[in-house]
């Protein structure tokens, strides 16, 4: 029998506070069969965050130990804090044929896309810079200087979105979630349609002949 096909690796990124995490969580809540890779970080928890749900919150020393041990699929330092994607979980789940979503920053997304060219890349953008400013300010965790810095960097982020497979404008959560779901369904259908290699393998093994 042919090997079980690997699951999709879906990379979702976008400017800070664009709402990519909210989109991913909403999709996971109503779409069975998709797994979420929880990243590790050294940044402090924000109000309402739970260890192991939004992130695994670990010390800088522990993070650096895991870097040295090669335990991260990708990692980056962003605004003075480390962020990284555990390698073992992603490789294990996709090998089992399950789809995995990564909600990561653009530096990490770039690293994953280089390692996994077949990954499905999705870039989330705000409907306007004013909407992004309001979302950053609404967090209540950023200083005015930090808000200004993130807004100044946003155009560069958005230009990078030109290299992604798909772009979602997050002006309505339900619509954004529906678009992400449609992207995943289309990609899964595409992998099924591109089944020539499987047929060739079965023919070579004689599974589709009368011999």
Curated annotation (Swiss-Prot):
Main localisation: cytoplasm
HAMAP family: Guanylate_kinase
One Pfam match: Guanylate_kin
Every Guanylate kinase-like domain range: 7-185
Catalytic reaction equation(s): GMP + ATP = GDP + ADP
A GO molecular-function descriptor: ATP binding
The enzyme's E.C. designation: 2.7.4.8
InterPro entries per UniProt: GK/Ca_channel_bsu (IPR008145), Guanylate_kin-like_dom (IPR008144), Guanylate_kinase (IPR017665), Guanylate_kinase_CS (IPR020590), P-loop_NTPase (IPR027417)
Domain of life: Bacteria
Keywords: ATP-binding, Cytoplasm, Kinase, Nucleotide-binding, Transferase
Enzyme class: transferase
Name this protein carries in UniProt: Guanylate kinase
Residues reported in the UniProt entry to bind ATP: 14-21
Function: Essential for recycling GMP and indirectly, cGMP.
Transmembrane segments: none
Location in or out of the cell: Cytoplasm
GO cellular component terms, semicolon-separated: cytosol
């Amino acid at each position: 029998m042919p090997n079980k096909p690997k699951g999709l690796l879906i990379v979702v990124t976008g400017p800070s506070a664009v709402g990519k995490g909210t989109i991913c969580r909403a999709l996971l809540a109503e779409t069975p069969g998709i797994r979420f890779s929880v990243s590790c970080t050294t940044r402090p928890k924000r109000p309402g965050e739970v260890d192991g749900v939004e992130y695994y919150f670990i010390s800088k020393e522990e993070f650096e130990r895991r870097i040295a041990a090669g335990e991260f699929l990708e990692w980056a330092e962003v605004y003075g804090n480390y962020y990284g994607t555990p390698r073992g979980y992603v490789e294990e789940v996709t090998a089992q044929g399950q789809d995995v979503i990564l909600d990561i920053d653009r530096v990490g997304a770039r690293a994953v896309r280089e390692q996994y060219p077949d990954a499905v890349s999705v870039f989330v953008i705000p409907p306007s810079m004013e909407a992004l400013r309001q979302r950053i300010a609404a967090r209540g965790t950023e200083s005015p200087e930090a808000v200004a810095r993130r807004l100044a960097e946003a155009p560069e982020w958005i230009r990078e979105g030109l290299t992604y497979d798909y772009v979602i404008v997050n002006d309505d959560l339900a619509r954004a979630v529906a678009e992400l779901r449609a992207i995943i369904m289309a990609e899964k259908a595409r992998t099924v349609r591109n089944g020539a290699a499987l047929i060739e393998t079965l023919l070579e093994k004689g599974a589709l002949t009368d011999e």
